[in-house]
A protein has these predicted regions:
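Proteins with a high burden of low-complexity, intrinsically disordered sequence enriched in S/T/G/P/A and R
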Residues: 1-3, 72, 189, 202
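ALDH superfamily catalytic-core signature
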Residues: 2, 8-157, 180, 220
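Short catalytic-loop micro-motif centered on adjacent basic/acidic residues
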Residues: 2-5, 195-197
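Conserved C-terminal structural/oligomerization subdomain of aldehyde/semialdehyde dehydrogenase
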Residues: 37, 87-93, 120, 140-265
Length: 265
C-alpha cells in the first residue's frame, strides 16, 4: 500500500514519483547538511564534547550528523572554539568498531571512503583549508580497513559545495557568522532541512532559533536531535519527502482509515 525510504534525496524523489504514479502513499527521508550554531555564551567544554560526538559518531555516516559548525561572536571566540574542537577531534581513537576502547570505526565501504576523499578535494579547490587531516590515517593490524581520521575544514563559507551537500563522513566544516540572524539565514538557505542545533545559555536565543529555522529536527544544547522511543522524526524540503511527516502522520502512514455511517431502525 505504500513505500517508506531513508537515503539520498535523489532516490527519495524517484521513489516518490513512482509511488504517486501507482497511487501509493510515500514516506521518505532524504539527504542532509546539518548545521550547529555555537553562541558566545555557550558552555564551551560541554559544547565541544557534544559536537565531537555529533560529528564523528558513526564515523559521520548518519543523516543526523552535524556537518557545519558555525560560531557566532568575535574572532577571538571563533579561534578559541576552533582550537578546542580540533584538540578534541585529535583525541578520538580510531580502530576496529567492536573494540570498546575505540571511539570511531571505519567507513562502511571503500566507495564511501573514496567519496569523502573527493569531497575534501572539492573543499580545497573551493578555498577551504584543512586544520586537521585524517586522510592518511593508518590503523595497526587493519591495513586494508576503510579508515579515515577525524578531519576539520576551516575557512568554509555557506556557498561552498562542501557546506551545501552531504559529505557523509568524518569531516567537520567550521564557519563564522556575524550574528544569529545570519546563521539562521544560512540554514534556511540550504536546500536540505533535516536537522539543526544551537548551543547557548540564552532562552531568548534558543526560542528564536527553534521558531525560525526551517528544519524538521531541532536540538537545543543537543548535537544530535535524535528521536527516542515514540518521539517523532522528520525533515523538511528535500530532507523529508512524501505525503506524511512527523508526529501524528507517522502512525497514519501505517493505518487505513474507514468512515462508517450507520442508521438503526
Amino acid at each position: 500500500e505504500g513505500t517508506a525510504f531513508v537515503g539520498t534525496s535523489t532516490v527519495a524523489l524517484k521513489l516518490y514519483e513512482l509511488s504517486a504514479k501507482y497511487g501509493k502513499r510515500f514516506l521518505g527521508g532524504g539527504s542532509a547538511s546539518n548545521y550547529a550554531i555555537v553562541m558566545s555564551d555557550a558552555n564551551l567544554e560541554k559544547t565541544i564534547m557534544s559536537l565531537r560526538d555529533a560529528k564523528y559518531g558513526n564515523t559521520g555516516q548518519r543523516c543526523l550528523a552535524i556537518q557545519n559548525i558555525v560560531t557566532v561572536g568575535s574572532d577571538e571566540f571563533h579561534e578559541k572554539f576552533k582550537n578546542a574542537f580540533i584538540n578534541a577531534a585529535r583525541g578520538i581513537k580510531v580502530g576496529y568498531g567492536l573494540d570498546e576502547s575505540v571511539d570511531m570505526g571505519p567507513m562502511a565501504s571503500l566507495r564511501y571512503k573514496e567519496n569523502v576523499l573527493k569531497w575534501i578535494e572539492v573543499g580545497l579547490e573551493e578555498g577551504a583549508k584543512i586544520a586537521l587531516d585524517g586522510r592518511n590515517l593508518k590503523v595497526e593490524d587493519y591495513p586494508y580497513g576503510f579508515y579515515l581520521g577525524p578531519t576539520v575544514m576551516v575557512d568554509v563559507t555557506p556557498d561552498m559545495k562542501i557546506a551545501k551537500e552531504e559529505i557523509f563522513g568524518p569531516v567537520a566544516n567550521l564557519l563564522k557568522a556575524e550574528s544569529l540572524d545570519q546563521a539562521i539565514e544560512w540554514i534556511n538557505g540550504n536546500k536540505y532541512h533535516h536537522s539543526a542545533a544551537i548551543f547557548t545559555s540564552s532562552g531568548r536565543w534558543a526560542r528564536e532559533f527553534k521558531t525560525r529555522v526551517k528544519v524538521g529536527n531541532v536540538g537545543i544544547n543537543i548535537g544530535i536531535a535524535a528521536p527516542m522511543g515514540w518521539f517523532p522524526f522528520g525533515g523538511r524540503s528535500l530532507s523529508g519527502l512524501g505525503d506524511f511527516h512527523p508526529q501524528i502522520d507517522t502512525w497514519q502512514f501505517f493505518t487505513d482509515k474507514k468512515i462508517t455511517i450507520v442508521r438503526w431502525w
